[in-house]
């Protein structure tokens, strides 16, 4: 088993999503001692946001017309796609920032969502090319967005489920911790509940 571990929180050791992704990966390793893990810290080693020259590398067949910096970004894009395609389980740390995901995580998504590599266009519509993988998302929020009037503000989990589904990955599970900014007791309770839920999610990922 190969695990791709993505962190995107800017909060370092204070990050709840990092606590959860580390716990998820540890449990995957315990149950699969031979597993290999690739860790990408998208906040510490940020991926430059997509621009025209970088996107052109998705279709390029040579070095003509590109400078050294752009060619390095083309190589980075290829490495990121290769890691995704080679992995069996993707563990994503995705805190909610302003109702969506961190821009650092979006930058990774923009690099790996490549026509002809991770999805393709057909006469009947797009088809994902990365099926058979499993995604476990550590979803963290300062408030409550899974239910009630604020549920309509959630452009985090729905977006991730949609984009991974577009790439062909339909097995997307969430380990959620909410109300993290509502005091120490609420934070502790949320993390405890998330850790409890994590065991079932990991077991499902391994068993399926």
Curated annotation (Swiss-Prot):
Entry's Gene Ontology molecular function annotations: electron transfer activity; FMN binding; oxidoreductase activity, acting on NAD(P)H as acceptor; oxidoreductase activity, acting on NAD(P)H, quinone or similar compound as acceptor
Cofactor comment text: Binds 1 FMN per subunit.
Source domain of life: Bacteria
SUPFAM superfamilies in UniProt: Flavoproteins (SSF52218)
The EC number(s) this enzyme carries: 1.6.5.-, 1.7.1.17
Keywords from the UniProt entry: Flavoprotein, FMN, NAD, Oxidoreductase, Plasmid
The protein's required cofactors: FMN
Subunit organization: Homodimer.
Job of this protein: Quinone reductase that provides resistance to thiol-specific stress caused by electrophilic quinones.
Protein name, per record: FMN-dependent NADH:quinone oxidoreductase
Organism: Ralstonia nicotianae (strain ATCC BAA-1114 / GMI1000)
Gene: azoR
């Amino acid at each position: 088993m190969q695990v791709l571990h993505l962190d995107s929180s800017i909060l370092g050791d204070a990050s709840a999503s990092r606590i959860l992704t580390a716990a998820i990966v540890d449990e995957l390793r315990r149950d699969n001692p031979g597993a290999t893990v690739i860790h990408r810290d998208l906040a510490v080693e940020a991926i430059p946001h997509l621009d025209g020259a970088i996107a052109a590398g998705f279709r390029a067949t040579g070095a003509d017309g590109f400078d050294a910096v752009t060619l390095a970004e083309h190589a980075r894009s290829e490495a990121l796609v290769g890691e995704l395609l080679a992995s069996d389980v993707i563990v994503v740390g995705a805190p909610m920032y302003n109702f969506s995901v961190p821009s650092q995580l979006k930058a990774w998504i923009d690099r790996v969502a490549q026509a002809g590599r991770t999805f393709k266009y057909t006469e009947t519509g797009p088809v994902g090319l990365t099926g058979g993988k499993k995604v476990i998302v550590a979803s963290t929020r300062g408030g409550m967005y899974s239910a009630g009037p604020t549920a309509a503000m959630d452009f985090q989990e729905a977006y991730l489920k949609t984009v991974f589904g577009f790439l062909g990955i339909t097995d997307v599970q969430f380990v959620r911790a909410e109300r993290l900014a509502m005091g120490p007791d609420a934070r502790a309770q949320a993390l405890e509940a998330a850790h409890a839920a994590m065991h079932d999610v990991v077991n499902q990922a391994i068993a399926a």
